[in-house]
Amino acid sequence: MHYSVLLQESINDLNINPQGIYIDATFGRGGHSKAILNRLTTGRLIAFDKDLDAISYARENFQFSNFEIVHASFASIYDYCLQHSLLGKIDGIIMDLGVSSPQLDNAARGFSFTHNGPLDMRMDVSKGITASQALEELSVDDLSYIFKVYGEERFAKKIALRIKDYIQQNGSIRKTLELAELILATIGKKEKKNPATRCFQALRIYVNNELKDLEALLENILAVIKSGGRIAAISFHSLEDRIVKQKFSALINPKQELNRITKMLPQDSSQIKLKWITKKSKANEDELNQNVRSRSAILRVVEKL
């Protein structure tokens, strides 16, 4: 079953205008979209998703005149708004980052290190390289870098060397459990978390360009949102959250150069573009009991001035 994490908190913090225009940057199974639509009267919602399964689900279950689903990465939101004359007209954006429960639970998608399936990991199966192909094509140094930076894996080089050696001997790694067991054999189980967790996260981020897409969205988000509009971001790991926090913070407290003569910071409020609505919120105990995956979720909400 799919749970939308921090659902009520994020929707409440968006302060929905019933006549407004909203964007769900990560449709998934439509939990946040449904909650927004329930609060709209003459307003409308545009949702984005790279996953064809999510697109099919939306077309079958969200047949509303004020709803549109777009098969695209949220990195293309600016271009979409430009093409449809919506720049500066969006009342709110919600983004629920990372992989969804249906993607994790379906072994055939290749995201799970506990259920065997093809080592794919693409959110959009219509294009791009699979995780299996990435392991074959990347050098030891590149693979090590991905594990270290995207997965924060301290044994990155050791795992990368073992993987490339295994591929040289066996031709490829085609199954998720094949990779998970290889990682376990390389570094052992030293903590409660599955030893494959970080490498699977890193590979998924690389295959789907997740952090680059997030940076592209945030780079242009001010041009999309209207004054008084709000942005809600839910992240599930420190890399995503760091990007969100740093971007929001830079627009709330912009770094300014000291005046060389007065040695004082210029008081230029025009450089301040956002204000915090929710600096940091986490799932409460009731939600944690319902959905263990919500334990790492962090919600941050800002408003455009």
Swiss-Prot record:
GO function term, MF aspect, one: rRNA (cytosine-N4-)-methyltransferase activity
SUPFAM superfamilies the UniProt entry points to: Putative methyltransferase TM0872, insert domain, S-adenosyl-L-methionine-dependent methyltransferases
Subcellular location: Cytoplasm
UniProt-listed InterPro entries: RsmH, SAM-dep_MeTrfase_MraW_recog, SAM-dependent_MTases_sf
Keyword S-adenosyl-L-methionine: yes
GO CC, any one term: cytoplasm
UniProt keyword terms in alphabetical order: Cytoplasm, Methyltransferase, rRNA processing, S-adenosyl-L-methionine, Transferase
Reaction(s) this enzyme catalyzes, per UniProt: cytidine(1402) in 16S rRNA + S-adenosyl-L-methionine = N(4)-methylcytidine(1402) in 16S rRNA + S-adenosyl-L-homocysteine + H(+)
EC number: 2.1.1.199
GO biological process: rRNA base methylation
UniProt: S-adenosyl-L-methionine binding residues: G30, G31, H32, D49, F74, D96, Q103
Enzyme superclass (EC): transferase
Its job: Specifically methylates the N4 position of cytidine in position 1402 (C1402) of 16S rRNA.
Family statement: Belongs to the methyltransferase superfamily. RsmH family.
The name this protein goes by in its record: Ribosomal RNA small subunit methyltransferase H
Species, as recorded: Francisella tularensis subsp. tularensis (strain SCHU S4 / Schu 4)
Protein's gene: rsmH
